[in-house]
Amino acid sequence: MKGKHEMTKFNLKTIQQTPSDIDKSIVLIGMPGIANVGKLCISSLIDALSATKVAEVFCSDFPPQVLVEPDGLLYVPRTTIYHSRLEDGGTKDLFFITGDYQPTTSIGVYEFADYLAKKCAEEFKAELVIATAAFVRDNLTEVPHVFISSTSQETLELFIEADKTELFKNGTVTGANGIIPAMAAALYDIAGVCCLGETAPVLQSDPRAARAIIEVLNQTLHISSDVTKLTPFLDELIKEIEPVFREAKNQLDMDKMRDQTRDQPYIS
């Protein structure tokens, strides 16, 4: 046996120690959700930047099931944390958090959010927590916009300056992708922002929306001088799902036209 572990609400498995000289960092989060927009976004950045896996978090409030991989091996669902240090234009430490599931209960989501927000504050020395997720519409657009909300006016203005962004107001962001940045601000005095890519729930995955978010992140954070270096994974997916996207868009457009026709008053 490699060691004994008592299962608690959260079990942390350290893969590699984070650099000891981190002065401040930015944390980017993308948990599974509608059209997997957030997870696709963060997974693409992790891959493009060759980020290093530093930790895994196991949560007792995840769905009670394990995943079976293509080779037949069992895999326990987890949240995974990665780190990347960018040196161009000065040192910039980025942490990425994504995973297989979100907690299944309201209490679980809040406890999970607090656990990660505290880690962002105390271990990662985060000055900004960015959550990526989906903004649900009843139609699909050729060029998705990114809807921005934030815990501070200063951060909001910074992100809303990027191309193809809109202010998100008078609504809710459900789940960990909304609660983590909000809780980081409320309890740990870390600025938080939500970047929500425009999509429709008919899609199981939407790399277009994820790519739109990465374009906004790159304009704001200056991650790369060439945004296409951050999106090869998504660009390939976009090509693969093009027929699915076209079919879904046409169906939604027809449904909308029928609804508009049905709503027109009869005039004689």
Predicted region positions:
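Internal, conserved structured core segments that host functional sites
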Residues: 103-156
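Secondary-structure boundary elements
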Residues: 52, 115-129, 186-191, 223-225
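Hydrophobic/aromatic beta-strand patches that form the interior of the parallel beta-sheet core
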Residues: 55, 95-97, 128-130, 191-196
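Conserved active-site and cofactor/substrate-binding residues in soluble primary-metabolism enzymes
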Residues: 36-40, 107-111, 115, 175, ...
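N-terminal short beta-loop-beta anion/metal-coordinating cradle
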Residues: 2-100
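Short His-Asn-centered micro-motif
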Residues: 31, 97-99, 132-133, 173-176
